[in-house]
Amino acid sequence: MVVVTGREPDSRHSDGAMSSSEAEDDFLEPATPTATQAGHGLPLLPQEFPEVVPLNIGGAHFTTRLSTLRRYEDTMLAAMFSGRHYIPTDSEGRYFIDRDGTHFGDVLNFLRSGDLPPREHVRAVHKEAQYYAIGPLLEQLENMQPLKGEKVRQAFLGLMPYYKDHLERIVEIARLRAVQRKARFAKLKVCVFKEEMPITPYECPLLNSLRFERSESDGQLFEHHCEVDVSFGPWEAVADVYDLLHCLVTDLSAQGLTVDHQCIGVCDKHLVNHYYCKRPIYEFKITWW
């Protein structure tokens, strides 16, 4: 007995496959055939789309031209509507994409006429551009605020040793203290210093020059850990202590935390000769609810 099926051959090895597009690799062969000659085992016909395409993006309805969806070849949308992949339709015949459609209109506006979203939508539209693999849109969004500024900020943070690890430590310490004390908030001490070299409490050039003449044994006395929960520094960049504090507040707030901080003094530990550690100490207050 010979059993003949209508299963489509693997089109990934056919001459018509998009070998250069990563977007198309995300799709599987059609779960439901678009056109078959049942019982004869013949290849499936490509799915055909109308010139004007009705869309259902996660429940949000849009209508656009097929040429708009295919404007850039190496994108997920161009691959989806190339005819090589089966796109399901809803009860009204709209082609369905299981994705939040809140910002899909901004994506369509770029494909239609090159329009860019307002600044407050840039981050969200950038996420959609990544999903649909729209390179030209990604490139332009990354040259807009706030993404352009974020690139500069990350370049600075890249010079900061263990920044992410220390940030996580702040959150974990604050959480543990709040739980242990059954408190709404927790406080912790954070040292932020740009320069490794401690300074004297006196503005005296003679005393300051001593730091360049210290012995190796004296050098060990300069290496100490301030009595704080977390320390940030040193770093080599124009950005100063206040810039790093701003980064800390920004990243902690992005996790949904309420953050307050204030300088409560300096370490002031005596090191050697006339030298005292003058690294600033900040008190961070993390409020959980």
UniProtKB/Swiss-Prot annotation:
Give tissue specificity per the record.
High expression in brain, particularly in post-mitotic neurons. Expressed in the mitral cells of the olfactory bulbs, the hippocampus, the deep layers of the cerebral cortex and Purkinje cells of the cerebellum. Not detected in astrocytes or microglial cells. Also expressed in heart, liver, spleen and kidney.
Q: Which GO terms describe its cellular component?
A: cytosol; plasma membrane
Sorted alphabetically, the keyword list is: Cell membrane, Cytoplasm, Membrane
- Which SUPFAM superfamilies is this protein grouped with? POZ domain
Which Pfam families does the UniProt record give? Answer: BTB_2
User: Which protein are we looking at?
Assistant: BTB/POZ domain-containing protein KCTD7
Localization terms from the record: Cell membrane; Cytoplasm, Cytosol
Q: Where's the BTB domain?
A: 53-141
What main location does UniProt list? membrane
Q: What's an example Gene Ontology biological process for this entry?
A: positive regulation of transporter activity
The organism's superkingdom is given as Eukaryota
- Identify the gene encoding this protein: Kctd7
Description of how the protein assembles with itself and partners: Interacts with CUL3.
Q: What does this protein do?
A: May be involved in the control of excitability of cortical neurons.
Name its species.
Answer: Mus musculus
- Where is the region Disordered? 1-42
